[in-house]
Amino acid sequence: MSVRYAEDRYPGGDESAGIASLHAFSFGGFYDPGNLRFGALLACNEEHLAPGAGFDEHRHSHTEIVTWVVTGELTHRDSAARTTVVRPGDLQRLRSAAGVRHSERNEGTEPLVFVQMWLAPREPGGDPAYDIVRGIADSTPYAVPEAGAMLHVRRLAPGERSAVPDGAYLYAHVVRGSVLLDGEELRPGDSARITDARGLELTGHGAHDDDRAEVLVWEMAQPG
């Protein structure tokens, strides 16, 4: 198991425009040839947008983009004339396929924090697609079959345990709270990368009963 701590992430964004970013993988102007991807996962970015800030319309292709809002509200607009407001607990997926344009902005009055994860599809091309799941439950994994991946959301009270799925590649990102994974304490922004995961368990590790942890766990097959 390889643990990457929150402070190890690459900073990015444009603070003068109200945007602060933290990148777990090489991204934009930050290039590390030893940290390009893990399994199908190409990016895990934590984005902080001040009220009124955002990413203007831009193009994506051949990428599966999954977004998880931590606090605030994210307004998504795309080239299919779709406008969606994504809130905490919602999961948004954009399949960019052969090409799609979209914008992401904080049109609310409170700061916005979201985690956005990019995955490589097994086959390029195809038609763009969009999906949103409102208030996804812990027991409902979300499949991204085009990337051979499954996302599991785990919310744990202190002392509560949950099995981690077995998989060729497993990536865990702590959104909030504290957990133990294979005896290693992980805090917000920390992540773990595990190959050939078998029989692992997450345990909530908060100091108080209301210190619930939230973890995003990607279960990924061997790249196709």
Locations of regions flagged by a protein language model:
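Jelly-roll (double-stranded beta-helix
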Residues: M1-G224
